């Protein structure tokens, strides 16, 4: 074989190994300095992944020693979600450059801060959402539902935590994990409110479902993508260990700027056997934002939910677009709050748990799989939403009560 042919084959082999990419978003807002999410290629074995993490840790420590730095940082979270593998942590740019050179790495993404998708809170006021989703026509305050009410389904509230001792949960709620830091409690109230809509005895839809608190956002309602992916990772592993895959739902009433890693992790969790309802997000009414520009609302296979008003219109704050699968009540929703209390909130945060709750109820009553739930809800949904937004469905959530 000629030297020219050998050289050609050599360089062809080199080019066949695609270099890892550092995803650098044009919008730099909410980026956490020196914090990264590293995602492996799909063909990397678990054993090779473990070896890679040991190598990356050694590189990190060597760079610190070379710089004479006393900083710690390094690897923080490890992700294994239905074959999707990655990790996150605080690393110097020199370490990230070495990681990008590794053939097992698919891409590296800067970590970002994340926020809730609720807007306003007003304590102790009446609600309307339950009556609306159980009747074809507006204006009925009675909630009509199948008595199985989510029995046998496990709900994962990926949020600010849940007041697991709230009387409306009747002992069905347990604490799961905390990736946000702080106390193992809901110091904000958002997570308890969304959980109450999903599975509260008085304020909820799937009144017999189990609840698991997955705290990924702080008392101030903020967090990081890396911690949210870890919450998803923990939930999948918990569901697998407790034989709940295929019989589980998750609500994600949170959002932030577009993230490839968050979208992939959320999609893998859905495909692993958890039905996931995601808030479409809220923006200033003058912005008119497309949910395709946010995560995890733009993730594949999940059920993205926009917010409707009491008059069956699109809420002025609600994101819209082709990613939206369905609308659900999202203004002035009363539900549980910490300390055995109740309160009123508005936002796509309040719409998504209606879908998670009906999803749990439909899974229990019809025996369908998580992958079938969203299409089923769209199938039975009501064509009621006025001004839904350009290229957006006009379907409103309905629990198929027959009323």
Curated annotation (Swiss-Prot):
Pfam families, A to Z: Inhibitor_I9, Peptidase_S8
Molecular-function GO terms, alphabetical: serine-type endopeptidase activity
CDD domains (UniProt xref): Peptidases_S8_PCSK9_ProteinaseK_like (cd04077)
PROSITE patterns to which the protein is assigned, alphabetical: SUBTILASE, SUBTILASE_SER
The Inhibitor I9 domain, residue ranges: 35-116
Signal peptide (UniProt feature, chain positions): 1-19
Source superkingdom: Eukaryota
Enzyme class name: hydrolase
Cellular component, GO, one term: extracellular region
Active-site positions on this chain: 159 (charge relay system), 190 (charge relay system), 349 (charge relay system)
Enzyme nomenclature, EC number: 3.4.21.-
Glycosylation (residues): 233, 251, 399
Propeptide segment residues: 20-117
InterPro entries: PCSK9_ProteinaseK-like, Peptidase_S8/S53_dom, Peptidase_S8/S53_dom_sf, Peptidase_S8_Ser-AS, Peptidase_S8_subtilisin-like, Peptidase_S8_subtilisin-rel, S8pro/Inhibitor_I9, S8pro/Inhibitor_I9_sf
Gene Ontology biological process: proteolysis
This protein's UniProt keywords: Glycoprotein, Hydrolase, Protease, Secreted, Serine protease, Signal, Virulence, Zymogen
Subcellular location per the Swiss-Prot or TrEMBL entry: Secreted
Domain Peptidase S8 positions: 127-403
Functional summary from the UniProt entry: Secreted subtilisin-like serine protease with keratinolytic activity that contributes to pathogenicity.
Family: Belongs to the peptidase S8 family.
Protein name from the UniProt record: Subtilisin-like protease CPC735_035780
């Amino acid at each position: 074989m000629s030297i020219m042919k050998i050289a050609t084959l050599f360089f062809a082999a080199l080019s066949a190994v695609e270099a890892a990419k550092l995803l650098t978003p044009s919008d730099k807002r909410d980026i956490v300095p020196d914090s990264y999410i590293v995602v492996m290629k799909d063909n990397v074995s678990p054993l090779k992944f473990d070896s890679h993490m040991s190598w990356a840790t050694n590189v990190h420590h060597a760079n610190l020693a070379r710089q004479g730095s006393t900083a710690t940082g390094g690897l923080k979270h490890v992700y294994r979600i239905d074959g999707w593998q990655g990790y996150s942590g605080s690393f110097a740019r020199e370490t990230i450059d070495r990681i990008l050179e590794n053939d097992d790495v698919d891409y590296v993404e800067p970590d970002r801060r994340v926020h809730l998708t609720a807007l306003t809170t007003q304590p102790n006021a009446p609600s309307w959402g339950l009556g609306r989703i159980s009747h074809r026509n507006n204006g009925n305050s009675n909630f009509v539902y199948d008595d199985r009410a989510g029995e046998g389904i496990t709900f994962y509230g990926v949020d600010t935590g849940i007041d697991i001792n709230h009387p409306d949960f009747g002992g069905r709620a347990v604490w799961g994990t905390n990736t946000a830091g702080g106390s193992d409690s809901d110091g904000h109230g958002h997570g308890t409110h969304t959980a109450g809509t999903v599975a509260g005895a008085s304020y909820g839809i799937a009144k017999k479902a189990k609840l698991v608190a997955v705290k990924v956002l702080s008392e101030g309602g903020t967090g990081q993508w890396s911690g949210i992916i870890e919450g998803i990772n923990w939930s999948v592993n918990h569901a697998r260990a407790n034989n709940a895959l295929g019989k589980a739902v998750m609500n994600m009433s949170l959002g932030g700027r577009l993230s490839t890693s968050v979208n992939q992790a959320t999609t893998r969790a859905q495909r692993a056997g958890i039905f996931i309802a995601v808030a479409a997000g809220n923006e200033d009414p003058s912005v008119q934002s497309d949910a395709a520009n946010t995560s995890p609302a733009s993730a594949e296979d999940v059920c993205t939910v926009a917010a409707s008003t009491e008059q069956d219109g699109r809420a002025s704050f609600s994101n819209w677009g082709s990613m939206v699968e369905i609308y659900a009540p999202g203004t002035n929703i009363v539900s549980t709050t910490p300390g055995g209390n109740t309160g009123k909130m508005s936002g796509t945060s309040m719409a998504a748990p209606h879908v998670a709750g009906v999803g749990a109820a439909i899974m229990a009553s019809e025996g369908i799989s998580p992958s079938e739930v969203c299409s089923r809800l769209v199938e039975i949904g009501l064509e009621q939403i006025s001004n839904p937004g350009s290229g957006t469905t006009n379907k409103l959530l309905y629990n198929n009560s027959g009323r």
